[in-house]
Design a protein with these regions (language model features):
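A general, composition-driven signal for non-globular sequence regions
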Residues: 2-5, 21, 69-70
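Extreme N-terminus of proteins, especially the signal/transit-peptide cleavage junction
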Residues: 7, 23-28
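Bacterial N-terminal signal peptides
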Residues: 12-23
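Flexible loop/hinge segments at secondary-structure junctions
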Residues: 28-350
Length: 350
């Protein structure tokens, strides 16, 4: 009888121990990221789905690409995010690797009474002249010539830009530098530039809010923000001289010829690409993570999150009009993870 009782106790203890071990093994590691506002809607959607699937959480701070680079460089987050790819020498200096996680489009948005969404037509040089302060009125002959039949008001244009360090601004100004020699020589490109005119909003959210509130305004935001905030967006003339509307198909067309393996850190810039359907201000958003992981469990969880998102998040991306990374690019990214991201002992964490 005593022997049987001891066996039962051992069995119960074993079950409790096994349960405790399983519970410990299943404990999820929460991770932190910070940076670009451009991909925030899709990262938030992926994070919610990933939490439900795995129990692991992501706290992503949508603070702008400049802030994301600062935080990952300072090692205060597990990964940074930027729409402006870091140069190879800067990645090397800071011990970082970079990979593209999602693609999308930056669109000009406007608040103009009587002009429907998608009705206004703009060229890159015209947008540059508006932000240079040369085209000041909505009924300027240059705008009217491109938009016959639209009742453009005799109203001042209020240009809205980004006040923070922004990858969206990098894509916007990189494009304008390609299509306007005057823009390139006076303002140039960057995550933050010295604007000639306009009011600044913080984040894509801030620009969207200003455009929604200010009658006669124009701004630039990632397409998901335009849709979420029900903002009117313009058609644009692309490199092939075709007028195109923003859509995931046209973003895909712009990315079709990208050679991700040819640039250090896969830092391909997709603005002003050829192709009849190409949207002219298309770009990728990049993830930055340290090669040498001082907290390998956190590093592993970052890679698990993006691995899961690449495999399971394509429809979510499509629903928000982002463009998921193609399978061959994902395989290239995974090979970089395997060969370059290691723990303190030099062992790969992927």
């Amino acid at each position: 009888m005593e022997k049987r009782r001891v066996m039962k106790l051992k069995s119960a203890f074993g079950a409790l121990l096994a349960g405790a071990l399983l519970s410990g093994a299943a404990q999820a590691v929460d991770i932190t990221g910070a940076g670009a506002t451009f991909p925030y809607p899709i990262y938030a959607k992926w994070a919610d789905a990933y939490k439900k699937a795995t129990g692991a959480g992501l706290n992503y701070q949508s603070i702008g690409s400049g802030g994301g680079i600062k935080q990952i460089t300072a090692k205060t987050v597990d990964f940074g995010a930027s729409d402006a790819p870091m140069k190879g020498e800067d990645l090397e200096k800071n011990g970082l690797i970079q990979f593209p996680a999602i693609m999308g489009g930056v669109v000009p948005v406007y608040n103009l009474k009587g002009v429907k969404s998608g009705e206004l037509k703009l060229t890159g040089t015209l947008i540059a002249d508006i932000y240079l302060g040369k085209v000041k009125m909505w009924n300027d002959p240059a705008i009217a010539k491109l938009n016959p039949g639209i009742g453009l008001p005799n109203q001042a244009i209020s240009a809205v830009n980004r006040s923070d360090g922004s990858g969206t601004t990098f894509l916007f100004t990189n494009y304008l530098s390609k299509v306007s020699a005057e823009w390139k020589s006076t303002i140039g490109e960057g995550t933050a530039v010295k604007w000639s005119t306009g009011v600044g909003g913080k984040g894509n959210e801030g620009v969207a809010n200003y455009v929604a509130r200010i009658d006669g305004s124009i701004g630039y935001v990632e397409y998901a923000y335009a849709k979420q905030n029900k903002l009117s967006y313009a058609q644009m003339m692309n490199k092939d001289g075709q007028l195109v509307v923003p859509s995931d198909d046209n973003f895909k067309a712009a990315a079709a010829g990208a050679d991700w393996n040819s640039v250090p850190g896969m830092g391909v810039v997709l603005t002003d690409q050829p192709g009849k359907a190409s949207w002219p201000i298309t770009g990728a958003s990049f993830i930055l993570i340290h090669k040498r992981q001082e907290k390998p469990e956190n590093g592993k969880e970052v890679l698990r999150f993006f691995d899961w998102s690449f495999k399971n998040g394509a429809k979510m991306a499509d629903d928000l009009d982002y463009v998921p990374m193609p399978d061959p690019v994902v395989k290239l990214i995974q090979s970089v993870w395997k060969s370059q991201i290691k723990d303190a002992s030099g062992k790969s964490i992927y």
